[in-house]
C-alpha cells in the first residue's frame, strides 16, 4: 500500500483531514496486515490526535470510515439478532492421523478420484490448509466496499449485531481496497487476541485492581461482547479472514486459496501460515509442522483446518447436517498438567444425573486456570483409582473441558481417601439410584428436585406434552429463579399480575400464557404421562401405558410384572416407571396437578388382555384391495389379534396380505421371500388355523 500523496498544510483542513485518514489507515495496514510497522507509535499518536482536533473543529469532515470512529460510541442496551444470509456452519473434528486419512478417503470417494489396483488414489485431492484460531467467529458485511455490519456466529443461523464493537478493531478495514470491490461481501473470520497483547491487557487489569482474564480467548470474547464499545476500543483485538458468505458483483474465486489471496488485495488481514497440499500425506505434514511451532506462534491455536481447495469440488461434496463434507478441523492433542485433588463433590444435572467433580488446586493448563474437572461417573473413579489427596494429571479434553486423566500413584499420601457416592441427592434429599446396566447414578427426585426443575418444567410445557404455548426457557428461568414455580403444579397458580412483572413480559404475553395454561388443563392421559418426564418413557410408551391401563391410578400402583405386560415395555423401562411413582415427591406433584380439577383427561377401561395367538407380536403389511374388507377394518382385526400393521415391507415383516392391484409391496415381499396371504388366508391365520 503506497504512501499518501504530498502532505497538505494545516491551512487546508479538508485536504489535511483526508491525508491524515489515509496515512493512519496505511500505517494500520502495515502494522496489522503486513506485520511491517513503519510509523513509530509516537508519530502515529501525534497524527491521530491532529485528526481528532480537525474533526472536532469541523464536524462536517468526519467520515464513517475515519480511524477516529474506532474509539467506540454510545453504550448499547443489548445486542440485536442478525440472521445470516448464509449459515455459519461448524466443522467436523478429527483428533488423530487416522481421522485425517479417513477424511481424505471420504473426500476422494465422494469426488470419484481414480485409484490403482491396490486402491491407492492416483490423483490426490488438493486441499487448502490453515490454522484453527482459538477466538470468536465473526461475519463482516461490506456493501460497495464499505463496512456496514458485523455479527457473531451465534447458533450458526442467527448471531448478534456487534458492528460498533468491531468498528474499533484496527486490523479490520472500514473501506476495502483494490479494483475488484464487490457490491456485497460477507467476510467470515476470527477475532482473537495476540499473546503479547493479552499479557499487556492483564498488566493493565492488575494495575487497575481489576480481575485478570484467564486466557486470550476469554479476553477476546469479553471484549467483543461489551455493551459499551469504548471498552472494546481499549482492548487490543485482532482479526484474520478465512471464509466467505454472500458475494455479489464479482465472480467467486475458483479456489479457496485464491479467495484468501484476493482478500489480501482488498486490504483484509489473512494469516500467512497457510499452504496448498495434496492428499492425506500433505495434510499430515502441514499439521505436524504447525504443531512443532505451535508454542512459538504469537497467538493461540487449537488445531488446523483442511478444506478442499477447488470450489467446484466443494459444491459436489456438499454438506451433511450442520457441517461441510469438504472440510475438517484437526485438533491438537489436549494439554496436560499436574495438580492436587483436594476434594470430590457431586453435581446434579438437569436430568438428575449425579456426576462426581474433582476440586483441584488451581493449575494453568491448555491456556486456562483449572480448578474443577469432571470425573465422569463412579465407575471411572474406581477404574482409575482416583482418591482425595492424590496428585493427578489434568487434561483439557479438546482444549475445552478439563478432566482428570489419572492419579500419580507414587505420590499418593498415606491419608488419601476413596470417593463414596452419596445415597441421597445433595439438592433435594431424594434417594440416589443406579440401575445395574448403567454407569450413571441418578436422583429419583424427579419433579421435586431443584436441579431438575427447569428441565422438568420445559419438558412439561412441550408441544407434544401439555402444549403450553408461550412458556419458553427464558420465562421458566425467571419463574424458577424468582421462586415463583417449584413444580409443574405451581404453573396453574400463576396470575396475570405475577406474569406482567417478569422481565420483557408485556400484558398481551401474560394473557396469552394464562389462556394457554387454561387450555392445557384439558389434555389426554397419554400426553399427561409423557409430560411427567419419566425416564425412558417417550410418546409411544406413554400411549401404550394409557391404552393398556385406561387410567392413571392403575399405572401409579402397578408392579414391575404388571408394567412388563404393556406393549414394548421391557425391564429397564418398567423399573424406571415403577421407581418414579414410588417416589413420594412425584406422587405429591401429580396429586397437586389433579387437585381441584386443575388438569383433567378422559379415562377409559383398560385394554383387553393382549392376545397370545399366532399373530401376537408379528408385523403385517396390507397392500391392494381386499374382496370384502376395507383396509381399516383389516387393520383393526389384525391389531386386535396382537399384530403390528406396518406401512412398508422390510426384512422384519412377517406376513403380507395382498388384494387386487397390489403393487410394489407385493413385489418386495416376493423378493424377500416373505409369506403372502390373500383375505381368506388372513382369516385362517386370525382363527389360528394357519401357521
Swiss-Prot record:
Output a single Gene Ontology CC term carried by this record: cytosol
Residues the record marks as active site = 132
User: Which biological processes are named by the entry's GO terms?
Assistant: DNA repair; DNA replication
Task: Tell me which UniProt keywords the record has, alphabetically.
Answer: DNA damage, DNA repair, DNA replication, Ligase, Magnesium, Manganese, Metal-binding, NAD, Zinc
Task: Detail which positions bind Zn(2+).
Answer: 425, 428, 443, 449
Which CDD domains does the record associate with it? BRCT_DNA_ligase_like, LIGANc
Task: State the Gene3D superfamilies in the record.
Answer: 5' to 3' exonuclease, C-terminal subdomain, 6.20.10.30, BRCT domain, DNA ligase/mRNA capping enzyme, Helix hairpin bin, Nucleic acid-binding proteins
Transmembrane feature ranges:
none
Q: Which residues form the BRCT domain?
A: 610-691
User: What's its top-level EC category?
Assistant: ligase
**Reactions it catalyzes:** NAD(+) + (deoxyribonucleotide)n-3'-hydroxyl + 5'-phospho-(deoxyribonucleotide)m = (deoxyribonucleotide)n+m + AMP + beta-nicotinamide D-nucleotide
The GO terms describing molecular function are: DNA binding; DNA ligase (NAD+) activity; metal ion binding
Is Nucleotidyltransferase among this UniProt entry's keywords? no
Give binding positions for NAD(+): 41-45, 90-91, 130, 153, 190, 307, 331
Cofactor(s) annotated in UniProt: Mg(2+); Mn(2+)
InterPro entries listed in its UniProt record: BRCT_dom, BRCT_dom_sf, DisA/LigA_HHH, DNA_ligase, DNA_ligase_AS, DNA_ligase_CS, DNAligase_adenylation, DNAligase_N
Q: Which family does it belong to?
A: Belongs to the NAD-dependent DNA ligase family. LigA subfamily.
Would you tell me the protein name for this molecule? Answer: DNA ligase
Corresponding gene? ligA
